[in-house]
Amino acid sequence: MITLYNTLTRQKEPFEPLEPGKVKMYVCGPTVYNYIHIGNARPAINYDVVRRYFEYKGYDVNYVSNFTDVDDKLIKRSKELNESVPEIADRYIQAFYEDTGALNVKKATSNPRVMNHMDDIIEFIKDLVDKGYAYESGGDVYFRTRKFEGYGKLSHQSIDDLKVGARIESGEQKEDALDFTLWKKAKPGEISWDSPFGKGRPGWHIECSVMAYNELGETIDIHAGGSDLQFPHHENEIAQSEAHNHAPFANYWMHNGFINIDNEKMSKSLGNFVLVHDIIKEVDPDVLRFFMISVHYRSPINYNMELVESAKSGLERIRNSYQAIEEREAIATDIEDQSEYIEQIDQLLAQFEKVMDDDFNTANAITTWYDLAKLANKYVLENTTSKKVIERFKEVFQIFSDVLGIPLKGKQQDELLDEDIEALIEERNEARKNKDFARADEIRDQLKAQNIILEDTAQGVRFKRG
């Protein structure tokens, strides 16, 4: 059974869907005013793996992820570029598909856009006003936060805690500093829509509530996003949605950890804002994805090139092992006396499912994949190989690949390049120096499986191709 950590209850819980065999999942998507940065890429990749694992377990997943195409950032960008907001949004939505496609993120079942739901948003706000949960003031519409009794339950804060530091900004006409905006009065020169409250545009929080409601219904199974969205965005979504629907908004809340750049928070002011569009010109997108899932989704992750290179090395180990298995397939026989390998492969598959069942622990899943690669390296050194064993290796390698979204072959994977071999030899030398003989032997076996022979000489270790 799959268990996942629920931010709402602060504990791991068995997953019990609203409808047997189906998952309704909503993931907060990007504001499309620029190319996505790696902070946007992390949830896209992490929750893609969650979706893939649910599908592997037989679930039908309705995966919805929105585009915020009406926002202060878009309006600012529109003025800077002298382009319309829809033009900018269209361009960066296309860029999003290109970048996430390169990262092997499956397309969502639906990617709703705010502009396409404007009538729905206005009706939703009208309902909240009619029920007394919202009020008009000076052309804006605000949500009465205190009227919603459960406010703070996701971020585990009380109203009194939240009141400290709450301020009414200049120009706002709120009843209470804790109230938040549902509809913003139009400003000269800004994109706007007609509404019963006057010309304006929606606030950020109401957009996701409405799109989730229209796409997935009153209650959804899983709502996911970055940790930075937990408060106030997701907290406000709950308040709006449950006030409107009179039903729980989401049964499970998932939040992924932050990304730091060289141990510093990513920010434009620090000049370390890293766009996926730029990274994948230098780093293989498969390696970037492998790096992203090498850490549990709830943990923070530190991005630097040393760690990315380590991920590249790890992925190469797996791919080289799979390639070696494929190469032995042509000379495999029908022998039946190697069942112990089948048993070990199946044990590793069971281990993979066990760690993925435990809150989608991709870090441990990758460790299991390394173990499978290590077993494969050992097997290809056998004098004779079995078709059944080779086939089972290939099946399980493919399962791991499909679930984690990491292709077993690079886009141009041929034989190992000389510089790759030299890098492995250097890694082996370091392992031997550190008395990590198991890793040293593993590298030797990996190279041997690729018909690369190591020779110790007075000048150091050399290699030759067999």
From Swiss-Prot:
EC number assigned by the record: 6.1.1.16
Keywords: Aminoacyl-tRNA synthetase, ATP-binding, Cytoplasm, Ligase, Metal-binding, Nucleotide-binding, Protein biosynthesis, Zinc
Catalytic activity: tRNA(Cys) + L-cysteine + ATP = L-cysteinyl-tRNA(Cys) + AMP + diphosphate
Example GO molecular function: zinc ion binding
Primary subcellular site in the record, as a coarse category: cytoplasm
Ranges spanned by the short sequence motif 'HIGH' region, renumbered to the chain: 30-40
Ranges spanned by the short sequence motif 'KMSKS' region, renumbered to the chain: 265-269
GO cellular component: cytosol
Binding site for ATP: 268
Gene Ontology biological process: cysteinyl-tRNA aminoacylation
Subcellular location: Cytoplasm
Cofactor binding summary note: Binds 1 zinc ion per subunit.
Binding site for Zn(2+): 28, 208, 233, 237
Cofactors required: Zn(2+)
Family stated for the protein in its record: Belongs to the class-I aminoacyl-tRNA synthetase family.
Complex formation: Monomer.
PANTHER family attached to this UniProt entry: CYSTEINE--TRNA LIGASE, CYTOPLASMIC, CYSTEINYL-TRNA SYNTHETASE
Protein name listed in UniProt: Cysteine--tRNA ligase
Lineage of producing organism: Bacteria, Bacillati, Bacillota, Bacilli, Bacillales
